[in-house]
Amino acid sequence: MFFVLSPAKNLNEKDPAPVSEFTQPDLLAESDILMQQLRELAPQQIAELMHVSDKIALLNAQRNAEWNTPFTPENAKQAVFMFNGDVYEGMDANTLDIGQIRYLQNHVRLLSGLYGLLRPLDLIQPYRLEMGTAFANLRGKNLYEFWGDIITNLLNDTLAQAGSNTLVNLASQEYFKSVNTKKLRARLITPIFKDEKNGKYKIISFYAKRARGLMVRYAAEHHITDPEMLKNFNYEGYAFNDAASNESEWVFMRSEQIK
């Protein structure tokens, strides 16, 4: 069983990683192709392309200029400790022990606009390139065309090597669109997290993102390899709702008063 997650825009570059183990991204040669093009963009072009402030555009122009291989622990950081958004706050990998972190390495993959598909302990350098960015490149008009079936093929290889036939999709639609589900050789399960508000259950983005990270943490802490065991997920008041679920979409609900 493998999980896929989206990356995060916010990055934690300052704090040292709690573990020394690391791996290298499998698709770094592809990343280098993209970065060569990104380096050609002036800050104003980055601001327009990514719809960000001049300050953020300048920061990322500097990141692009400084991006260089080979990646080492001195100039890069493991992805699971670099990403710093809602999902990763829910996962809180910094407080997992080494056995649990190795579980993440063996069961979790992170989608990325620049790096394609990452293992949690893959070293990365800071960047900003969301998968949905309309970044015209050598292979097409956007990143979905750039990556084509590369991410899907690597996922299939990863699943096959592990003898796994289940992929748990905890990524956003923007990122999971980079996976060709028609060519994916795995059973696909998509957990959906709903919170009660004014008597009705709905997906609330912040809570849903955090819950995705919580589920991965739950799996790591319990060393889950059987997807059915995920139905026992109960962190922060969530509970599996069988009546609202089907074979491929598993719904977890949380009552308003529990938060």
Swiss-Prot record:
Similarity annotation: Belongs to the UPF0246 family.
Species assigned in the record: Neisseria meningitidis serogroup B (strain ATCC BAA-335 / MC58)
This protein's name: UPF0246 protein NMB0895
Cellular component aspect of the GO annotation: cytosol
Pfam families per record: H2O2_YaaD
InterPro entries: YaaA
Domain of life: Bacteria
Biological processes, Gene Ontology terms: response to hydroperoxide
